Amino acid sequence: MLTNIAKKIFGSRNDRLLKQYRKSVARINALEEQMQALSDADLQAKTAEFKQRLADGQTLDGILPEAFAVCREASRRTLGMRHFDVQLIGGMVLHDGKIAEMRTGEGKTLVATLAVYLNALAGKGVHVVTVNDYLASRDAGIMEPLYNFLGLTVGVIISDMQPFDRQNAYAADITYGTNNEFGFDYLRDNMVTDQYDKVQRELNFAVVDEVDSILIDEARTPLIISGQADDNIQLYQIMNTVPPHLVRQETEEGEGDYWVDEKAHQVILSEAGHEHAEQILTQMGLLAENDSLYSAANIALMHHLMAALRAHSLFHKDQHYVIQDGEIVIVDEFTGRLMSGRRWSEGLHQAVEAKEGVEIKRENQTLASITFQNYFRLYTKLSGMTGTADTEAFEFQSIYNLETVIIPTNRPVQRKDFNDQIFRSAEEKFEAVVKDIEECHKRGQPVLVGTTSIENSELVSKLLTQAGLPHNVLNAKEHEREALIVAQAGKVGAITVATNMAGRGTDIVLGGNLKHQTDAIRADETLSDEEKQAQIAALEDGWQAEHDKVMEAGGLHIIGTERHESRRIDNQLRGRSGRQGDPGSSRFYLSFEDPLLRLFALDRAAAILNRLAPERGVAIEHNLLTRQIEGAQRKVEGRNFDMRKQVLEYDDVANEQRKVIYSQRNEILTSKDISDLMQEIRSDVVSDLVDTYMPPDSMEEQWDIPTLENRLAAEFRLHEDIQSWLKADNAIDGQDIKERLIERIENEYAAKTELVGKQAMADFERNVMLQVIDNQWREHLAAMDYLRQGIHLRSYAQKNPKQEYKREAFTMFQDLWNGIKFHIASLLTSVQIEQNPVAVVEEQPIGNIQSIHSESPDMEELLGQSQTDLVTEAFNPDGTDFSPEALEARGQIVHRNDPCPCGSGLKYKQCHGKLA
């Protein structure tokens, strides 16, 4: 109560921010006439002027009013769109690194141009992040004329682009792309073995469209680059036969083999279930008699069994996935879109493939991963925009340090939001939905019906067909027709059935989207120019009449067939109606069979229902019920927030390790001379090895000299008689032995370097180091994943799982780092160089030049392409200079992908171009 009184007296934080922004709006508006008076050339020259002022020390905030005024005027001239005052406020909110909540239809795409233009002037690049390739290409195409007019370049990142094209797109002043593409490019950049293969620049400023969808809904979905692991595919098929033999428990304490916790989306085997599963697996010959699923040797069996149980109990066709072209394609639970190319991890995808009888593809091993939470926190400045952020404002603030500012609408919202209607059964609910649609259709009012699953959208479609009502269905299966269906959803009497509308990205215009219709006519190659003009003219004449008719009928009517777990998704559905002051209405139809009511509000709601006891087909409308449902939604939102926060807390541990590894990789990639680093690694490894078998401050009797000598011979090809050193000099200690061994290793290494050349050896070292780091990091990620999966069991021993995870992860990372150094030192020290004469270069195939030999059995696998790095020396015995500078001086033009002129057969960038 005191908070409400304070808000009335002083205004809310949001009110105070808007008041400050309006002062800046007044300054921008005061410059409008001045900008309108400028010629195109003078207006365009402002960009160069701003860049110079920034170079002279002025800040972006200092030039903001002028830059916004220039962008607004340029937009008016190139796009025919002038920014409203509230859009100027939105632009300032984005520039300040905050989230702008703007209603559907308020022009978020245009708002972004203000902050994007201003921040692009700094020359460090700006990323505009969208939810799919279509929106990235569309928004970039619409706004490119504006940016080009102002002297800025625009790039677009879409899937399947080649690295060279990606480099060009990232080099542009402004880069559009999806959250997935930006994230995967970051991971790929940290896997390259040549710094020139990187595509991204520094992560400077990002504007995230539909920020709640990306930073909230997808926060728990990590980006993973993976490779195929060695896996027994037949085991998935065998395990798929086990779940039908196990009995599902009706309640958590009931009889049976396993309990399905729908709230937590988990399957828990009971004690009896473990015994039953062990009996079945023993009969199948997969488990030895009296053996346990919990023994270390049977971890893989337990992993496959739980994956099969989850596939059968929690993942359902046409709700969580569809089968398309013989493959399992995941359905996004928030947007209803197909997520082609994505696969569930931990063997779940293979278990679902086995359940559905489609081809089982091998389980993947993680090579690199990052969550969106940690990726977007890498940007120097981050901002976002959406129509629904206020309900998640606390999460944005606590996790991303992003404040949410609610931007007022340009025109007052005219939409009427009716109370929910609640029915006893789903059958009664859908009957009422069809009746409401029928009434709207009769008066010409367009209707958008929102469902939470493909299954429900197809059920509604079936009922509408039976009622003789024409309609369009928009769900994951109709992805190709999506834009066309949405564009016409506002026509007179149109009925559109859609899975969740989150992130659809296309406004529903009353009377139909005229631009989409005229574009379709212009693209029709069967029509002549005269026919096209005639059809467009007729369309434009008829559109206004249709628009007016829809307005009179009440605008777009939204029908929700059930409440989503998140109020935000419900608000997104409602927000499709009433854009820019248009009339509209919305109503949700619920039943006590809906998952939300069944799982979270059943007890009290059932008691209320029994008291009211309506007849069949009669709806209940009661404030207490509405509050009960909203309370259930808040409960789910709170639980989901806790889960996302927990994911972040665990991922933060891996994130710190990731930063160290990627920083070290980058240092190796970019350093011209890594000899000091190599020397330090060799010294550390030898010191650690000596300390292991000759512990400091220990007696000589405790030393294990024979094992030390064997390890030195096996790992470093260093055959030294340390026993004789000790006999010859009684005063010798561990430190003296370290110094002698390091001196021997350094002398041998210097001889090898002299043999092949310093630069060639440096490149060889760099490749080996990178490959060792990548291999060891990959194994570490798998170990961290296994640790994470089982760490919750520590709570049974009265230990804090998070603290235990941090402690063990730290120990594992120390072991990782020591292992990396040991493998690098061992491989590079044990390498032998063989000189093979090259009499006639043209007749000597590269494959016959054996530059490196190793007794280590996995040397070939670890080194891979590194063997060819020494070829450059063999093909250039007279030391001819093939550097870019020398070639240019001789008038030779050699591009990076051309064959090297030395005759090695390698590309220039992999040969002397790389050495340069």
Curated annotation (Swiss-Prot):
Keyword Nucleotide-binding set for record: yes
Cofactor: Zn(2+)
PROSITE patterns: SECA, SECA_MOTOR_DEAD
UniProt-annotated binding residues for Zn(2+): 900, 902, 911-912
Single GO term (MF): metal ion binding
Protein's UniProt keywords contain Cytoplasm: yes
Protein's cellular compartments: Cell inner membrane; Cytoplasm
Keywords from the named record: ATP-binding, Cell inner membrane, Cell membrane, Cytoplasm, Membrane, Metal-binding, Nucleotide-binding, Protein transport, Translocase, Translocation, Transport, Zinc
Main location: membrane
Enzyme Commission identifier(s): 7.4.2.8
Pfam families with a match to the protein in the record: P-loop_SecA (PF21090), SEC-C (PF02810), SecA_DEAD (PF07517), SecA_PP_bind (PF01043), SecA_SW (PF07516)
Quaternary structure (record): Monomer and homodimer. Part of the essential Sec protein translocation apparatus which comprises SecA, SecYEG and auxiliary proteins SecDF-YajC and YidC.
Family: Belongs to the SecA family.
Listed name of the protein: Protein translocase subunit SecA
Organism: Neisseria meningitidis serogroup B (strain ATCC BAA-335 / MC58)
